């Protein structure tokens, strides 16, 4: 009995988990119910097995992972249970408002259980009204039969954006009572055409970025939609996600969209809040569950995979993750080359045109992601990236550090129930969970920062994750709060009615409170300039960045101040300034002084191009990266000289820089290649520097065939360099390229010959 009493203290954690008292039964979590005597239940500890968890009992409380099972990385922080079923069920996504409320999208009707709740799924609102650190109020904002496990939720002022395939739905709470009433409030389908009605590889959550645009993504089920500007996007892949909408995803793979580019699902995009001017910002994912956008405008995401190569990644603008072939017709497995590991093959890291995968950590099923800039955790955690990984019972933490043109992502377990790494109930462990341990039931589905600055984590709670399965018939869920020990919930008052109040709200820890502040300042016009300008002196660089984005809205007073930030000592602030000026130029907010001797005004296209040429020699690779990707749709006559300057700054090894540069050369590869080789002072292909060889490899136009054949045949080069030359030839569709590979195969031996033969046998078409 002494041992049982000791374990009970661990089980009960902070005392909030009365739901796991000495109840003789737990709820049914699997197909084989059984009874557990109270003495056994009392003895349960995190590492003790829970045999085939148990029979249903209408009077028993819902299940929850006790806080004593959870551990947080910092001893100065504590985990408390903020909410649990029946206050919420099966949480798929969270968002937060400025008053401290947590909004939850539920997924009771998930996949095979789509009829479990005939009234449809809900968006619920939870609140801690007495400040004791525990939700005590619950209401339902909306419940509809058409809501079947919605995968995304955003709350921006009185607009509630729900991602429910095939639609992005915007509810406007006109009277702000947090209860949708169709007689008073508005419901609009903003965009439609996302395949996968009951599939979690479809449309995911919307996030407002610091530039006022909405960011969102969809998995690889396929999408064909028309934005409010009238442009249609056709995004398929080699994955058959069903035919819910009357077209086949695999048949639209490789088709051009109306923006002139070929995009492969999954993908991420940004657009104006009215659904116009969609721009794809990354593609060829498997199923990225969510994205997070920093105040600098950097985008981070995670992506689940065919085990074992899940990843957390900095998303390069227009980046190709490489899950399918460039035309979307073939899976990564069909193109896997001899000697390639799964991570290298799956994210095509030896192919030109694919971005670095970031942190590839193995099997899993990543879900929600958040970037922490302002929180109760203090300056130590400013810039903390959090990524939920339910397959591993953990919320990963990263503190991204600039590294070349990208970021170093060093992973640690921020919050976990499974320090031992004994996983079960996941695809990478075979799917089944015959030995269900309490520590493996923690399935974090989303994470974010609340109005009190604490971190909130939603728990799906289930023995199974992945494979479109859920085994918890109780549909239990919970929300945990991570904060400094003794933290009291005191959300700051938000006043968006005045420029001063709205400017102050730009410092709020809640992402979409800051978004509402941006929108309010935009509506207030020039009167907002002075209070926002003061924020440029804030010691927090994220606050300075937010101010820059708001100032870029004003052509006369604001944009010149943003232009002044191009000389800032912080490279990230220079990145923000350049991005803001580029996006202003895209919107044509300022006319060019064509034919005039007057200096070009910030915000004009001419000023943007002058700035791009100047910053092509910036000491920061990150700044030069942004210059490179901004040139994608520019003609060679404009982009060529800038790209050649950027080429001089390539160190020969920085893959993010190389891909950014290649993105800038899109559609003009042959011209850039010719100029690049001409600039090499007559060096033959075999004598190319490593930097020139990599740049040429990234371009690989038809005019490069002779040069790469020479490199493939050159025994003076390493086998790795010769195989890289074969890759450049293999990615060229010209018959001359096939002849070149054949010649290399005939005249080589060993691994080079084997590589050449692979290309010949696998590119017969």
Which positions does each model-derived feature cover?
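Long, ordered, helix-rich scaffold segments
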Residues: 475, 482-593, 599, 604-765
């Amino acid at each position: 009995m002494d041992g049982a009493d000791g374990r009970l203290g661990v089980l009960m954690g902070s005392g909030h988990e009365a739901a796991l008292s000495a109840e003789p039964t737990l709820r049914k979590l699997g197909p084989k119910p059984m009874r557990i005597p109270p003495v056994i239940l009392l003895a349960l500890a995190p590492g003790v097995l829970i045999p085939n968890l148990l029979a249903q009992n209408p009077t028993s409380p819902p299940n929850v992972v006790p806080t004593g099972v959870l551990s947080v990385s910092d001893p100065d922080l504590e985990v408390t249970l903020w909410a649990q079923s029946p206050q919420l069920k099966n949480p798929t996504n969270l968002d937060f408002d400025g008053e401290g409320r947590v909004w939850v999208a539920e997924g009771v009707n998930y996949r095979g259980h789509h009829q479990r709740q005939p009234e449809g799924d809900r968006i619920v609102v939870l609140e801690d009204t007495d400040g004791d650190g525990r939700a005590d109020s619950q209401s339902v904002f909306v419940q509809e039969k058409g809501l079947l496990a919605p995968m995304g939720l955003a709350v921006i002022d009185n607009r509630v954006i729900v991602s429910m395939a095939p639609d992005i739905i915007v509810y406007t709470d006109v009277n702000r009572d947090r209860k949708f009433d169709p007689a008073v409030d508005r419901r609009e389908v903003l965009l439609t055409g996302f395949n996968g009605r009951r599939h979690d590889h479809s449309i995911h959550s919307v996030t407002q970025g610091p530039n006022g645009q909405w960011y969102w993504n969809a998995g690889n089920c396929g999408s064909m939609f028309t934005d409010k500007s009238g442009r249609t996007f056709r995004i398929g892949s080699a994955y058959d996600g069903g035919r819910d909408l009357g077209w086949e995803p695999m048949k639209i793979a490789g088709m051009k969209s109306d923006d002139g580019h070929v995009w492969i699902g999954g993908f991420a995009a940004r657009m104006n809040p009215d659904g116009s001017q969609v721009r794809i910002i990354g593609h060829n994912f498997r199923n990225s569950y969510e994205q997070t956008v920093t105040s600098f405008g950097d985008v981070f995401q995670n992506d689940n995979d065919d085990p074992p190569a899940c990843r957390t990644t900095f998303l390069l603008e227009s980046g190709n993750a490489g899950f399918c072939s460039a035309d979307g017709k073939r899976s990564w497995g069909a193109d896997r080359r001899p000697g390639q590991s799964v991570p290298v093959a799956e994210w095509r890291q030896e192919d030109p045109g694919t971005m670095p995968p970031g942190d590839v950590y193995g099997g899993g099923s990543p879900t929600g992601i958040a970037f922490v800039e302002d929180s109760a955790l203090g300056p130590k955690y400013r810039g903390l990236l959090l990524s939920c990984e339910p397959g591993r019972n953990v919320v990963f933490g990263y503190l991204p550090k600039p590294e070349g043109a990208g970021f170093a992502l060093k992973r640690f377990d921020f919050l976990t129930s499974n320090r031992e790494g004994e996983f079960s109930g996941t695809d990478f462990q075979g799917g089944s969970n015959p030995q269900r341990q309490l520590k493996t039931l923690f399935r974090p589905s989303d994470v974010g920062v609340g109005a009190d600055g604490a971190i909130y984590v939603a728990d799906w709670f289930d023995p199974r994750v992945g494979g479109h399965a859920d085994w918890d018939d109780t549909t239990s869920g919970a929300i945990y709060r991570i904060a400094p020990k003794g933290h009291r919930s005191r959300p700051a008052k938000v006043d968006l009615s005045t420029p001063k109040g709205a400017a102050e709200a730009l410092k709020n820890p809640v992402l979409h409170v800051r978004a509402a502040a941006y929108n309010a300042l935009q509506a207030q016009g020039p009167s907002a300039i002075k209070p926002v300008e003061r924020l440029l002196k804030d010691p927090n660089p994220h606050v300075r960045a937010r101010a820059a984005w708001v100032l870029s809205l004003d052509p006369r007073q604001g944009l010149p101040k943003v232009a002044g930030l191009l000389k800032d000592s912080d490279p990230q602030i220079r990145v923000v300034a350049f991005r803001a000026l580029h996006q202003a130029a895209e919107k044509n907010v300022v006319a060019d002084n064509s034919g005039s001797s007057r200096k070009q005004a910030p915000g004009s296209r001419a000023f943007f191009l002058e700035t791009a040429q100047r910053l092509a020699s910036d000491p920061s690779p990150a700044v030069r990266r942004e210059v490179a990707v901004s040139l994608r749709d520019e003609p060679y006559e404009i982009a060529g000289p800038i790209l050649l300057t950027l080429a001089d700054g390539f160190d020969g090894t920085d893959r993010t820089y190389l891909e950014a540069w290649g993105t800038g050369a899109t559609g003009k590869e042959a011209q850039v290649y010719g100029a690049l080789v001409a600039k090499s002072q007559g060096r033959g292909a075999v004598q190319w520097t490593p930097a020139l060889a990599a740049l040429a490899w990234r371009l690989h136009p038809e005019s490069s065939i002779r040069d790469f054949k020479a490199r493939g045949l050159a025994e003076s080069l390493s086998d790795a360099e010769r195989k890289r030359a074969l890759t450049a030839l293999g990615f060229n569709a010209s018959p001359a390229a096939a002849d070149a590979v054949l010649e290399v195969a005939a005249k080589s031996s060993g691994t080079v010959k084997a590589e050449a033969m692979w290309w010949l046998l696998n590119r017969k078409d």
